[in-house]
Amino acid sequence: MSPQTETKANVGFKAGVKEYKLTYYTPEYETKDTDILAAFRVTPQPGVPPEEAGAAVAAESSTGTWTTVWTDGLTSLDRYKGRCYHIEPVPGEETQFIAYVAYPLDLFEEGSVTNMFTSIVGNVFGFKALAALRLEDLRIPPAYTKTFQGPPHGIQVERDKLNKYGRPLLGCTIKPKLGLSAKNYGRAVYECLRGGLDFTKDDENVNSQPFMRWRDRFLFCAEAIYKSQAETGEIKGHYLNATAGTCEEMIKRAVFARELGVPIVMHDYLTGGFTANTSLAHYCRDNGLLLHIHRAMHAVIDRQKNHGMHFRVLAKALRLSGGDHVHAGTVVGKLEGDRESTLGFVDLLRDDYVEKDRSRGIFFTQDWVSLPGVLPVASGGIHVWHMPALTEIFGDDSVLQFGGGTLGHPWGNAPGAVANRVALEACVQARNEGRDLAIEGNTIIREACKWSPELAAACEVWKEIRFNFPTVDTLDTQE
């Protein structure tokens, strides 16, 4: 008998295909504190039992493949395999269920969101035995969290850098998002910052196009920042989008921003990729730059309820990879966002310890072990009438960003910024006096209009604007 044949015989190798559930469905398994836990919404093909589908997810996202291989005998599968340890039905959905999978920590490279996602949401999402698959939530264990730097600075450090406390921060995305020259772009930035905003922002697809190259934009925006700071006595910033075609070019743009002395840069973390994002976050921490994160492309991944990945997972991944701000929906604006679900992942972005709460879509208790928090950014179709609701929903540790709601003011950009600042200050003062923003919000705004003609004009323009469409990605009703 040859040595190779002898090895196969000794490990009891038997060629062929066997059911996944014989190896990867282990309902008796007790999860460990070091396991990464995942909750998948699974829709199996007709005829595929839930246990087999759940086990297939565990197998194909860890050590398994479609057939038995003799090299299984050269390692300890019990140590390295993913395990489907629990299955539960989805209320109101006969063909869907939640499969809970535990992954040993040794399966993942330290400090790499890229590697974690390559395994957990890799090829398994194209598996033919599944009609659809969605990753609803992840529990990141402290042992793995501690291998990440996380956000470059975090909420408290940002407030200290900006010297701004006790209220949400105010921003504005410059519009039109494409087509302005660098000088006209810088003019709009100056007018908004001079009017009372804390930040202005490059839109996600502003990189370095023929009509406005990145270096020119950076220079004119820096001039606008310094001029508005000198005139207002407040620290100002503009999210300079450093996203580029290569990591090297991205870092070059961040270096130039640092040389200009501006406080913050920006990255499109999903289109740019997690490897690029983590690299930029490390640079920002080392060089004192805040990092604003845009989530362009997220709805391709997270909007459909039965396939893809919920944004709460992308939010957790961003906190690991690094970012000081991230767009998180508005609940009340033009973009998708269920209220309870949004509040759930907002807490996961900001808080150090978040308890399991299925009523808000949180499947696992998450301990961030002092990883810095991320400011959620509310942006998309919001205006001054939304200010009470936004202040009540998101609280002080947030960024409220009005693009069209600033630049669409009938009197111009600076009056639009004034209107938003007055509305915010009125809401914060009313809240601090004990008034209920959810009930008295419109009254508070009308009262402020009496001493702010800019706010009164904005209220008149947008009094009829509504985005009353049902949310596609709603929470399941728990029995």
Curated annotation (Swiss-Prot):
Substrate binds at N123, T173, K177, R295, H327, S379. InterPro entries: RuBisCO, RuBisCo_large_chain_AS, RuBisCO_lsu_C, RuBisCO_lsu_C_sf, RuBisCO_lsu_fd_N, RuBisCO_lsu_N_sf, RuBisCO_lsuI. The modification Phosphoserine is found at S208. Mg(2+) binds at K201, D203, E204. The record marks K334 as: Transition state stabilizer. One of its GO terms (cellular component) is chloroplast. Binds 1 Mg(2+) ion per subunit. It catalyses: 2 (2R)-3-phosphoglycerate + 2 H(+) = D-ribulose 1,5-bisphosphate + CO2 + H2O; D-ribulose 1,5-bisphosphate + O2 = 2-phosphoglycolate + (2R)-3-phosphoglycerate + 2 H(+). The keyword Disulfide bond applies. GO terms for molecular function: magnesium ion binding; monooxygenase activity; ribulose-bisphosphate carboxylase activity. One of its GO terms (biological process) is photorespiration. Belongs to the RuBisCO large chain family. Type I subfamily. This is Ribulose bisphosphate carboxylase large chain. It comes from Nasturtium officinale. The lineage of its organism: Eukaryota, Viridiplantae, Streptophyta, Embryophyta, Tracheophyta.
